[in-house]
């Protein structure tokens, strides 16, 4: 086996606090066969909660996947014991023998017909050929998947799957040599942390939370609050009066500069107002909330709760699907300038090739254009997509193609 990158041979942190077993299933590595170097398998810390479980960088690991050269072979009555070396270490692998039906199949009392005898003999010859071709000896490359366990105070792998690797030009070994450093970099060397502590750390890490992070965190908390309370519409100032949200928005933030970090406090009401405004803007971009009229002092509507919007969009799709040869008119910015110090934008409706078809239905952009022109509401594409998904879940409409919808 080629020598692995030395930077990837990281040891499991012995000082890291063990994550409660309740959260192990949240780590994808827990259910996977972890492709680790043998050196790391031998040095993993064993769990104090569940025997037979091990930790690498906080990742709970029980099953592993290794590939290496066989350096020793011991045959027992029911299993083989292979010593496998991947150039980082050597580990013993217990590989159970496949059950043989030679004795039972050769019993003449069982084989009643010549056809059965012929079939059995052919299967026996095939089995013998497979065993000869796949017989594993010293120097062969073997791949083993199995469970890590302790036997006589030594760590070994109890195989569930194992096979000889036919790799005369080292294609599979080189591919694995390139794969493992990437897995270590993207998965195994990224510590798995207790999910229950993430929220608390985010709230308590005032020295490291920047303005963008605070805005994103506040938007998530606002979203959770609206969902929990089943709010249909609200004003921004109403959210600013909610104590947990206000406390979060008023915490200190860190602004990075070229040479150092300067801590600024959002004590002023205007700063809190600005953070809430930015957080709601994020929710608008994601389509979770919308406004019928622009302005932070205007009423916000929760997209999933506004039945009036759902009904209007459904009616637009239902009516326009019955109008063949109808082309979509999309608002396009035609001129931008200033008048008396104020920005002025002139928009014109232009015909774009997005027809309404009786079979395919209405295009998403056609529906959005109808809402903007007829209702004059401040909607974006994300809001419309949220509504279309809700209507489709309720079986009111169906998607007939790429961004095309029709109503029942």
Curated annotation (Swiss-Prot):
Domain of life: Eukaryota
Localization (cell): Nucleus; Chromosome, Telomere
Annotated spans, Winged helix-turn-helix (wHTH) 1: 201-304, 305-408
GO CC, one annotated term: chromosome, telomeric region
InterPro entries registered for this protein in UniProt: CST_STN1_C (IPR015253), CST_Stn1_wHTH1_sf (IPR042082), NA-bd_OB-fold (IPR012340), RFA2-like (IPR040260), Stn1 (IPR014647), Stn1_N (IPR018856), WH-like_DNA-bd_sf (IPR036388), WH_DNA-bd_sf (IPR036390)
Keywords: Chromosome, DNA-binding, Nucleus, Telomere
A molecular function (GO) term: single-stranded telomeric DNA binding
Region (Interaction with CTC1): 8-195
Portion annotated as DNA-binding: 64-165
GO biological process assignments: negative regulation of telomere maintenance via telomerase; positive regulation of DNA replication; telomere capping; telomere maintenance; telomere maintenance via telomere lengthening
Function: Component of the CST complex proposed to act as a specialized replication factor promoting DNA replication under conditions of replication stress or natural replication barriers such as the telomere duplex. The CST complex binds single-stranded DNA with high affinity in a sequence-independent manner, while isolated subunits bind DNA with low affinity by themselves. Initially the CST complex has been proposed to protect telomeres from DNA degradation. However, the CST complex has been shown to be involved in several aspects of telomere replication.
Protein family per UniProt: Belongs to the STN1 family.
Binding partners and assembly: Component of the CST complex, composed of TEN1/C17orf106, CTC1/C17orf68 and STN1; in the complex interacts directly with TEN1 and CTC1. Interacts with ACD/TPP1, POT1 and POLA1.
Name of the protein: CST complex subunit STN1
UniProt source species: Rattus norvegicus
Recorded name of the encoding gene: Stn1
């Amino acid at each position: 086996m080629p020598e692995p990158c030395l930077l990837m041979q990281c040891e499991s942190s012995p000082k890291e606090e063990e994550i409660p077993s309740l959260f192990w299933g949240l780590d994808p590595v827990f259910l996977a066969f972890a492709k680790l170097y043998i050196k790391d398998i031998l040095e993993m810390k064993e769990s104090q909660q569940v025997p037979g479980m091990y930790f690498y960088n906080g990742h709970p690991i029980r099953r592993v996947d290794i590939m290496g050269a066989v350096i020793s072979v011991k045959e027992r009555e029911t299993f083989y014991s292979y010593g496998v070396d991947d150039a980082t270490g050597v580990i013993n692998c217990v590989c159970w023998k496949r059950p043989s039906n030679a004795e039972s199949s050769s019993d003449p009392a069982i084989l009643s017909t010549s056809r059965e005898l012929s079939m059995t003999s052919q299967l026996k010859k095939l089995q013998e050929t497979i065993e000869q071709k796949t017989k594993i000896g010293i120097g062969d490359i073997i791949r083993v998947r199995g469970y890590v366990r302790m036997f006589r105070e030594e760590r070994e792998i109890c195989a569930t799957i194992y096979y000889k690797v036919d790799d005369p030009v080292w294609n599979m070994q080189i591919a694995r040599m390139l794969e493992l450093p990437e897995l270590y970099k993207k998965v195994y060397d990224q510590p798995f942390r207790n999910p229950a502590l993430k929220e608390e750390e985010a709230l308590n890490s005032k020295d490291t939370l920047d303005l963008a992070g605070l805005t994103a965190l506040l938007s998530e908390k606002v979203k959770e609050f609206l969902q929990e309370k089943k709010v249909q519409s609200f004003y921004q100032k109403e959210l600013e009066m909610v104590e947990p949200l206000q406390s979060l928005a008023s915490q200190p933030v860190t602004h990075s500069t070229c040479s150092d970090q300067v801590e600024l406090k959002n004590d002023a009401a205007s700063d809190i107002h600005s953070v809430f405004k930015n957080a709601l803007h994020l929710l608008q971009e994601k389509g979770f909330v919308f406004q019928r009229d622009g302005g932070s002092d205007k009423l916000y509507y929760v997209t999933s709760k506004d039945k009036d919007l759902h009904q209007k969009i459904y009616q637009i799709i239902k009516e326009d699907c019955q109008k063949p040869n109808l082309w979509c008119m999309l608002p396009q910015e035609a001129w931008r300038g200033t008048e008396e110090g104020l920005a002025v934008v002139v928009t014109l409706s232009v015909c774009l090739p997005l027809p309404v078809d009786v079979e395919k239905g209405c295009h998403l952009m056609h529906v959005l254009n109808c809402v903007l022109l007829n209702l004059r509401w401040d909607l974006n594409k994300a809001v419309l997509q949220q509504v279309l998904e809700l209507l489709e879940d309720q079986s009111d409409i169906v998607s007939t193609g790429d961004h095309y919808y029709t109503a029942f």
